[in-house]
Design a protein with these regions (language model features):
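Structural signal for interior beta-strand "rungs" in well-ordered beta-sheet cores
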Residues: 56, 123-337
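Terminal amphipathic alpha-helical/low-complexity segments used for targeting or macromolecular assembly
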Residues: 1-127, 193, 199-200, 205-221, ...
Length: 367
């Protein structure tokens, strides 16, 4: 939880930095006296920040923007500060020297986002439908036309957006935010500080069917999905993303998992802590993905696989076998003009015969 400062005024730079956890700041180099601002009211890019805002620079290629920025303070890398301090021109803004400026920016942005939230008492819109058996903490807000099923437990500071549908016996952790029109099926457990975006469907039935010739030739019989979905703390799930419940055991998203929009996670999957997936990824059922992995957009991962920790998959890659070794993996045919692609694709189809001919030529040349 960020440190609470005086709500009646913007914090000074030193007050703001003291309120940010993590010990990220190496030092602060003061700017010109007439450029200092008594209060920091927000954070912005170098181009958009005003004189009462702090900004950041993460790459030397943006150095040219420093001359025109209106920010009263800028977060900089140590090597960038070395360049600035060696300049003959006085630097008007203060510099916050930090090895991880993007992370410090994120934490300052989190602080401002949190600080603007007023203290809340229980607020349930008159059109919301809340089952009498549900347990609702005193600081929860529930928007218009939301539905809260029997046996639910909604913990402190949770926010349920308009039109959300929450099934029976669902638990939602403290300080979690459900944007409008999220659907959560029965029995799903969500940890603290989750952010679930609109259109997400959590805990729907997995794709489980058994061939049933007693019904008809080629017919399928449904396999009831008896497991649930368990989501850890600090998980964010993007708009229109779907995560299925397990067939027998639970589908699990561990702490810190980040899912972009329009992702599909099949039943019985386990996604390790702090793994992040970009948009339109599909993960088939019963696959385990380790911790700290990144999965590029539109990648497809087959079912019943085990992918280890610290594996990074490039966008558009099809993963069809286990991956045990950490590293970056790519399986994308290079983009090219269509005519060139057709020629290369034709060659790909002949690789086996070309290989045989090459071996024959090598054998003949050796004899």
């Amino acid at each position: 939880m960020p440190v609470l400062l005086n709500p009646d005024r913007a914090p000074s730079l030193s007050e703001l930095l003291k309120a940010i956890p993590g010990g990220l700041v190496i030092k602060v180099v003061e700017g010109l006296d007439d450029w200092k601002n008594p209060g920091i009211s927000g954070i912005g890019s170098l181009g958009s920040a005003g004189p009462n805002e702090i900004s950041f620079i993460v790459h030397p290629k943006y150095l040219g923007q420093l001359a025109s920025t209106q920010a009263c303070a800028v977060i900089v890398l140590p090597e960038i500060e070395e360049q600035l301090s060696s300049s003959a021109e006085p630097i008007k803004f203060s510099r916050v020297v930090c090895k991880h400026p993007y992370l410090l920016y994120a934490r300052i942005a989190q602080w401002f986002d949190w600080a603007k939230e007023p203290a809340r008492d229980l607020c349930i819109h008159e059109t919301a439908v809340v089952d009498p058996s549900a347990t609702i903490a005193r600081s929860v807000t529930i928007g218009p036309y939301a539905v809260i099923g029997p046996g639910c437990k909604i913990n402190e500071m949770a926010q349920i957006g308009s039109g959300c549908v929450i099934g029976a016996n669902v638990e939602i952790g403290a300080s979690s935010l459900l944007h409008p029109r999220v659907t959560i099926y029965d029995g799903v457990k969500i940890g603290m500080r989750a952010i679930i975006h609109s259109g997400a469907v959590l805990g729907a039935d997995g794709f489980g069917f058994a061939p049933d010739p007693t019904l008809a030739k080629g017919a399928w019989g449904k396999i009831p999905q008896l497991g649930s979905l368990v989501i850890g703390n600090d998980v964010e799930i993007g708009a229109n993303t779907t995560v299925d419940r397990g067939a027998l055991e639970n589908t699990i998203l561990e702490d810190g998992v980040k899912l972009d929009n329009q992702i599909m996670i099949g039943h019985n999957c386990r996604i390790g802590s702090h793994t992040a997936m970009a948009a339109c990824v599909g993960v088939a059922g019963s696959t385990t993905i380790g911790s700290r992995c990144t999965i590029g957009g539109a990648s497809m991962i087959s079912g019943h696989l085990i992918i280890g920790d610290d594996v990074h998959v490039s966008g558009g890659t099809a993963v069809t076998s286990n991956v045990s070794k950490p590293g970056r993996y790519t399986g994308v045919f290079p983009f090219s003009e269509h005519a060139d692609w057709q020629k290369n694709a034709a060659v790909m189809q002949q690789l086996s015969s070309i290989r045989k001919r090459l071996r024959t030529l090598e054998r003949d040349s050796d004899s």
